[in-house]
Amino acid sequence: MTGNPSRCPAGSAGRLGIMRSMPIKLENVGIAVRDIEATIAFFTDLGLEVIGRDTISGDWADTAVGLDGNHAKIAVLKTPDGHGQIELFEYLHPDAIETEPTLPNEIGMHRIAFSVDNIETALELAAKHGCYTLRGVATYQDVYKLTYLRGPSGILVMLAQDLTKG
């Protein structure tokens, strides 16, 4: 099935009865980055584990991604609990397009969020990569400590510490 890649009416799949009962799980979140090695170092320092690396190209990659001449380095990382994965892409061809980092209130991909045992420790690790909070750490109803920071390539990352645990 193909169509206009820039348009998918919100809710149209549900209104048409498509995929209502199909089992689904989140596979990963894909993020295009400027420097895959620096980004891997950032996320592994936060506790994620690299579970695969490859360089992709060829007709299958062009078709799947929708870019002619697609050639990229990729890495898949998983969270320690095994429930979350991110896939990082560093494009070799076509050239990566630099954009301004997104703001929290912009429509589209917003952020990637991680639960951490100790937010201060996580922020110390992030600082080693030159990544700092946008405004500081907030406490939400004595339940969570939360913060947003800019990761490598301007990725908006949320860290959350559950204050109700131990």
Region annotations inferred by a language model:
Residues 32-83, 128, 147-150:
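Core segments of cupin and vicinal oxygen chelate
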Residues 58-62, 96-99, 140:
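A cross-kingdom feature marking solvent-exposed beta-strand/loop segments within repeated
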Residues 7-9, 18-22, 53-55, 76, ...:
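Vicinal oxygen chelate
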Residues 99-106:
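Non-DNA-binding regulatory cores of transcription-related proteins
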Residues 29, 112:
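Hydrophobic adenine-recognition pocket in adenosine-nucleotide-binding enzymes
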Residues 23-27:
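Extreme N-terminal starter segment of soluble prokaryotic enzymes
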Residues 92-94:
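Short, solvent-exposed aromatic-acidic interface loops
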